[in-house]
Design a protein with these regions (language model features):
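Active-site adenylate/phosphate-handling loop in enzymes that bind or generate adenylated species
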Residues: 143
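Histidine-centered beta-alpha loop that forms part of the nucleotide-sugar donor binding/catalytic region
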Residues: 113-114, 137-140
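Glycine-rich S-adenosyl-L-methionine
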Residues: 149-153
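Conserved alpha-helical substructure of the radical SAM core
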Residues: 2-132, 147
Length: 153
């Protein structure tokens, strides 16, 4: 089997991005919900602790602001939306926003370190599945992972 046969993205996706680019349609976008993360990965720039976020708050958007941006983006043709952070599951209004965005018709991907995925999260995603869940795997084993992320491997 060749690598091209292992490709999971449908050919339609490539066509959509090509057509959107020619028509100047913003087909995909990213919402960085919060800089807060429960890991301290050495290479990451969005890894503030809860205390750091509280002590040095940046102007974080409210759920209403994110929804307003999403409505504008959707009206312009955006279809694919990546939710990221920090750890997006730590953002207090994550589930409410996720549900709104899903109902707006976005194809949602989520970047997560996976540490907060439990039965509750799985059940939520079963009810309203994201298009993709990207779980970071930084290390060949527990030791290298823990060394890099400062979290249990």
């Amino acid at each position: 089997m060749e690598m091209k046969d292992l490709r999971v993205e449908p050919k339609l996706t490539g066509y959509l991005f090509s057509k959107a680019s020619r028509c100047k349609v913003p087909l995909s976008g990213t919402f960085e919900l919060s800089p807060e993360c429960n890991f301290r990965c050495g290479m990451c720039y969005v890894r503030k602790t809860h205390q750091e976020v509280q002590c040095h708050p940046r102007a974080m958007l409210t759920i209403d602001q994110w929804v307003a941006i999403a409505k504008q983006a959707r009206a312009e043709g955006m279809l694919y939306l990546l939710l990221t952070g920090g750890e997006p599951l730590l953002w207090p209004d994550f589930w409410e926003l996720y549900e709104i965005l899903s109902k707006m018709g976005f194809l949602i991907s989520i970047n997560t370190n996976g540490s907060l995925i439990d039965e509750h999260v799985v059940e939520k995603w079963k009810q309203m599945p994201p298009t993709r869940i990207n779980i970071t795997l930084y290390g060949a084993g527990d030791q290298s992972y823990e060394r890099l992320c400062h979290a249990k491997g």
